[in-house]
Amino acid sequence: MKTLLTHHLSQSEIMQLCALTQGEHNDNLKEELYQLTLDADRRVAVNALWVFTHFVADDNVWLFAKHDQLIDRCLKERDTTKLRLILTMLLRQPFEEEAVRTDFIDFCLARLTDARAPYAIRAQCIKLAYEQMRHWPELLDELRQTLEMISCEPLSPGLRSAWRHVMKKILSCNVY
């Protein structure tokens, strides 16, 4: 499988790799693909992550068991492309109240306020912060205040959209 990931992948090649790993009977291939996300060859690792972002919902469930590992990787990742792809994978996962990690909440809050961070990562962190903090009114209030703070700076259209979407959800919670 590694040789398939060593070059630029087309959309049809991504779909072929998704089909190859589809279904529970191919969980061993999903694990092989996941291990390739850790490969020393950046192209291989990025392509493997990219394939996971295209998994259908049923196959994406397999990644739920990797939830904490993916969060740990976010906390350490310095490559913005890999980080963006891992955050995309996490956006497709549930954040249960009893399993929320404060270190990841802190990570998301720090990234969404970092004007030097890429817009896509900031937008993803806005969404992920909400998914984690929505269980507690006091944390939602903290997120609302943080979002109000960044609203004064120039935001890209994508970042502004994420901001508006999450603010609408926060305000609809009727805690204010």
Question: PLM ranges: what are they?
Answer:
Residues 1-176:
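Alpha-helical scaffold domains
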